[in-house]
């Protein structure tokens, strides 16, 4: 790299890496190799690998600046990037070299990788999608950066105590984070509260409290390319360290109280929003992210172009869900109040730069903020939102003069529920493009949630089906299968997943079929070892591994899965000597800390597991396992070992899902409803290679319209009746027989909102077909191979190309 002085780049040989790791341990960490522990060796290795990425990173940044390319800025409250070391070594192609260097020093790379804390800066699919997107942006050489919050405490650590979920803090930074660069000089004032003062036409926001947003940068490496991008995370810092006056008077606690209050903003991911103060902190968090980010975007733009006139030509800002939608009024505020734009010009810029992804159609999950709360914390922004709404409703009135109901429905301010600001509405009114994340979801979006807006802005809505990065989800997570693919297809599938299609031609070759089967068995043995060590449950790797790992939520219907497990248990008890296909049912996922029913479901899974796993009549025929503290790194262990992937949400509720893609890519067959991306997976893999059951989205709606009566299913279906009676009468909770009465009531007597009972029989019958196929191992593996072969479409590289071409209009950087 050109520099005004000479220096020697770090080289990539085993010997050089060995020296580098030892050097980092001694001179950066300051530790004697004789007494250093695994964490210190891990950090030294991370520093050594990071050094080898820095030049690429600086070169990429320099190229983006010199070519004055249009950039995309991707805003998300969540980024679940997973462990960084294995991914970085894979991107650089130095996995074996680092392994060799560590071995020469008597260390085991796999053990060090397991020491790395998984940064829990997200809750589920939203954050993992954002991470896959950053990986693809870098691999494709597209100019972009992610912006999020550097939470001190990530998603809580989940412990299972007496069958129940208990949360403890997840301090992922306890051993430091060598992967990040703190940018002491990149800091912005973020303001809250205060009041607005009109001075003629000019508006001033005064008497505010201030905190600072300080930047921390992480390198996002592209695979096998010099292109790298940046994830910039903001940490909150008090604008003044302590109140010295109070300190000198001896009031030490009061002296630091303000500092602590300020820094709470980036302390924890998603504070409990069941209280007013929790909701207020959540709003402050969202504004903290957008204010720091929009100030940074404008500052970077001005440094490069010395004008704001070309803003709309040079930047695209993407809002991942509604959490960062306050970016819109913040951009308006900065352009009008600080950069002397007229209101109309500022609005025009916003309409050109913002785009928004909708991730849910469920009304309870759509963000709204009380007008009073917004007015108290962000008075200037509320004023701007009112102005945008007035402008929008005026133009609407001109277009539809006789439709007063439409004005009420389309207004950004919901007047019917205690005056609330609808964030999704604000995003749709201002963004130039709004996308859903699967064909089904995008269609439902314009037919239901945004039907009025689809009529008002017909060209605004589009679909971009989600994808996953093959680097992390196949190359890193599944070395056994990757080796088989490399041998028969070459290595280029890592950057062009459509090349997996060639695997179709190998489905009938016994040798390849056997190799794929063996790779699966190796992964199952690895998971079985983990389950034995961590949970003290012995499972048979030759049994069918039936897996459902995702957030615990009623719409994802883990409960229906449990009903099938109990049905299976009852059948085995009735005829223990029959030839049963042995199964291991594996669950994993966290329930939101204030979500009573989801926590109840976890308790039920563990109670059922306790009874089944300790029943001598059952033995290896059926095991039930709940793996606690689900994370990206656990997903990388579990997904490659799955035979059957459970994607059983009620049709019309899951926007897309991405674990469905990860499982199929790793050779699991899917059992699922026609929901989210399952619909497109069916199109790609063919109806013979996927297990589809249950009502369609139309049938679900029809059932609701007719008046769904769950009790009828309970009374008509003997097996279902038996299962629900067992749960309700305490068969699985003998020490507390009434524990699940309310849960059973919610299904039979209180509407069964997610229609578990309606789909139960179809689901159980479909599971019987799964058993039949699993007995024909070669045929099962051939179908698994067809799934792998047809996953090319579901690469996040394809997804990002679509965003780049149709929404962001950005081109790759020339390196």
Curated annotation (Swiss-Prot):
The entry's keywords: Allosteric enzyme, Carbohydrate metabolism, Glycogen metabolism, Glycosyltransferase, Pyridoxal phosphate, Transferase
Pfam entry (one): Phosphorylase
Modified residues (N6-(pyridoxal phosphate)lysine): 662
Keyword NADP in record: no
Gene Ontology MF terms: glycogen phosphorylase activity; protein homodimerization activity; pyridoxal phosphate binding
Cofactor requirement: pyridoxal 5'-phosphate
Protein name: Glycogen phosphorylase
Gene that produces this protein: glgP
